[in-house]
């Protein structure tokens, strides 16, 4: 009887050891797959990244995708946007919906959105007045939170392995554009709404970031690499003019980042 008890204990111990080894091996294997997917995205091999993601999802290994997406955002990787876009157009919309923050889906689907500057909690709009070139100045609205004045949508453009966006104001049917001239003191550039979008001054790219558990975006102009921001001066309506910022912003998400929320 004593022999049987000892034998049973040995069997249980061996089984437990095998289980632990199996779990450890699986964890190690998943970590390697995460690194492979992350590196494919960082090197711009998006077709491979999409193939891997579809395969992992079919195998029930979605946690790999989720961890990679989380790490990309924490690391402020611009390539997150390209990866998301290639999934969206490459039979991976279900992956975007399942593993990416909701605002990524809003952007890729071209849904109507609000762009809210985190620092001042003001929504981007175009002013009512046309200049001689039929352009309107862009502002952060000091009062409005819900009217179509602050309704925008992103229009995607893929070029040279990068995704860019035309940012379209649905109220005035104009596109966000960065001025070619700079302020003599700050070197910042004024931002307008314009009727056409046929140059890189009307194209923008996004860099995701995370701050205080919120997923936000830096919004950069393709032509000048200036980041979209709101100025410090408040006019009589409580509005602030929009500018392209001349300088580094990635280390200051609390000041220069934007919420993208449903309209």
Swiss-Prot record:
Pfam families: Lipoprotein_11. Coiled coil: none annotated. Residues 1-23 form the signal peptide. Keywords: Lipoprotein, Secreted, Signal. Transmembrane segments: none annotated. One of its GO terms (cellular component) is extracellular region. It is found in: Secreted. Its main location: secreted. Detected in larval hemolymph (at protein level). This lipoprotein belongs to the group of structurally related '30 kDa proteins' that comprise major protein components of the fifth (and last) instar larvae and of pupae. Belongs to the 30 kDa lipoprotein family. This is Low molecular mass lipoprotein 4. It comes from Bombyx mori (Silk moth). The lineage of its organism: Eukaryota, Metazoa, Ecdysozoa, Arthropoda, Hexapoda.
